[in-house]
Amino acid sequence: MVQIVTVEVFVLKPVRIWFTKDNECKYISHLDLNRVVMRALHKSKLNIWHTEGFNPHPFVTFALPLSLGFKGVKETMDIKLLDDDYNKEEIISALNNCLPSGIKVYDVTEPVMKAGKIAQALFEINLYPETVDLDTLYSNFTELLNQPEILVMKKTKKKGLKEIDIKPHILKVNVAKEDDCVKCNMLLPAGSTTNINPTLFINAYNEKYSDDVIYRITRLDVFNDKGESFK
């Protein structure tokens, strides 16, 4: 007698979840964000693939961690579904019902680019006058950006604090004076090779002008080295 063994085969379907991170959730660290998402995926009852081993958990990866306190409007995480026949709206609804209000899923797509291709990030930096008026803030910040070099102390993995010139890392910049703030859109290196945090420019401003400016930073988008938006 021949014993027939049947094996259930799943077709894993990678999908990219797009979400915003705002309000109180801006202050959730990347590690805590991972925990929040893990709980939401578990509660959502979505048919997703779990890692194997002693402690199986939903498989999820994030393209590029967002700095604490930053707002993100095009954040992504990748999961794997156990079936390639999925309903985008059902996934969005199921996750939003399990996530805190500061994290909002708005789209589900198939991954086009690998996270390792990310090389640039576009930030919106809003500066609010505190000890000086708006005109002076605008004048001072543009003066800072027009300097031949902008020297700051930056943490490195091997050498601790190191003085670097961040001026050459500005890929694009635009500064405008709004009704209540100075708005700066800045394209900076980001990804696995080089990362320049926009708060370094805030630190340079505060040190140069002995100020303690109020600011809000939003990451608007990330790109590959050809300037193509991450998809």
Predicted regions and their residues:
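Short beta-strand-to-loop capping motifs
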Residues: F19-K21, I79-D85, I125-T131, M186-A190
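Short amphipathic alpha-helices in soluble, non-transmembrane regions
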Residues: E89-L99, T136-L145, L200-I202
